[in-house]
Amino acid sequence: SSDYRLKENVVYDWDATARLKQLKPARFNFITDANKTVDGFLAHEAQAVVPEAVTGTKDAVEVWKDGDELPDGVSAGDNKLDADGNTMPNVQGIDQAKLVPLLVKTILELEARITALEA
């Protein structure tokens, strides 16, 4: 929520430009669609800069949990396997919308620098 009544420790003066410069945008394709190139981030790299925007843990895999209906010979804590016997990744993701405040603050900082240089 954006309601001020739900927030505390509000700070307006922080160096967004320095933080933004730590992000490493990349061009890549997904293994499932080798013919399509996209621009984005690698989640584990972005997590070091904007952890609030990243979900999951690098290299995590799906595991069987207590309460799951366990197949024969499987225990809670064992890795889940696909039909080919490969571990099933628990992939990371990035909520791109959570990058918007950082981008806006960086634009404002750069605009202030331009204005100062033009003065």
Model-derived features: positions:
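Intramolecular chaperone/auto-protease modules of tailspike-like proteins
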Residues: 1-119
